[in-house]
């Protein structure tokens, strides 16, 4: 058991019979009222994202999820197939179970498959991935006041905001938790 104010992004809890992962936790204390914590959570069974508010001292059931190393193999319709590199067992997950992970999947990509009560419910990507910029508009010279960003499409088809100096064909590092550009990388 944990109290609500101890939970952070990435914590897993059980509400009713469903497991949830905390996407965002915001502590709020106003003058007269009791402290509260506002959560943005994802139901690991249904994939639904919901908002909830709890008193800071409410007790929550924290749960441990099992993780298994895997490699993304291929897509079959709406199913995505991963394989355990030790046993070569195939693990199948639906597209809606993968969420933002779909933006970064490439064949042979290592990741973790998350299990809840012996059922695969999600995947956990590496914190950072390196991807090639396949399309972006050229940056305009002189348009550099402040932190100016532009859209760039990476080799998986996902668009990410990058600084003006990033050009087509370059490789960039992206934070998979926030979907944000981190830096250019040499390949």
Swiss-Prot record:
- Tell me where it mainly resides: cytoplasm
Gene Ontology molecular function: translation elongation factor activity
Any signal peptide, and if so, which residues?
Answer: none
Q: Which Pfam families match?
A: EFP, EFP_N, Elong-fact-P_C
Listed PROSITE patterns: EFP
* SMART domains per record: EFP (SM01185), Elong-fact-P_C (SM00841)
What keywords does the record list, in alphabetical order?
A: Cytoplasm, Elongation factor, Protein biosynthesis
Q: Which SUPFAM superfamilies match?
A: Nucleic acid-binding proteins, Translation proteins SH3-like domain
Record-linked Gene3D superfamilies: 2.30.30.30, Nucleic acid-binding proteins
One Gene Ontology CC term in the entry: cytoplasm
Q: What does this protein do?
A: Involved in peptide bond synthesis. Stimulates efficient translation and peptide-bond synthesis on native or reconstituted 70S ribosomes in vitro. Probably functions indirectly by altering the affinity of the ribosome for aminoacyl-tRNA, thus increasing their reactivity as acceptors for peptidyl transferase.
Query: Could you say which protein family the record assigns here?
Result: Belongs to the elongation factor P family.
Q: What is this protein called?
A: Elongation factor P
Q: Which organism is this entry from?
A: Fusobacterium nucleatum subsp. nucleatum (strain ATCC 25586 / DSM 15643 / BCRC 10681 / CIP 101130 / JCM 8532 / KCTC 2640 / LMG 13131 / VPI 4355)
């Amino acid at each position: 058991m944990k109290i609500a104010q101890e939970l952070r992004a990435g914590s897993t809890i059980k509400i009713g019979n469903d497991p949830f992962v905390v996407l965002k936790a915001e502590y709020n204390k106003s003058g007269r009222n009791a402290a509260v914590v506002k959560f943005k959570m994802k139901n690991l069974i249904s994939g639904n994202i919901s908002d909830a508010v709890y008193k800071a001292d409410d007790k929550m059931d924290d749960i441990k999820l099992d993780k298994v190393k895997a490699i993304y193999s291929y897509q079959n319709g709406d199913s995505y197939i991963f394989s355990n590199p030790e046993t070569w067992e195939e693990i199948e997950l639906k597209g809606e179970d993968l969420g933002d992970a779909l933006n970064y999947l490439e064949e042979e990509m290592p990741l973790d498959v998350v299990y809840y009560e012996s059922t695969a419910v999600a995947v956990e990507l590496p914190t950072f991935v390196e991807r090639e910029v396949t399309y972006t508009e050229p940056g305009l010279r002189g348009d550099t006041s402040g932190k100016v960003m532009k859209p760039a499409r990476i080799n998986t088809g996902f668009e990410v905001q990058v600084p003006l100096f990033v050009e087509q064909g370059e490789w960039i590092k992206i934070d998979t938790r926030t979907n944000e550009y981190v830096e250019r990388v040499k390949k």
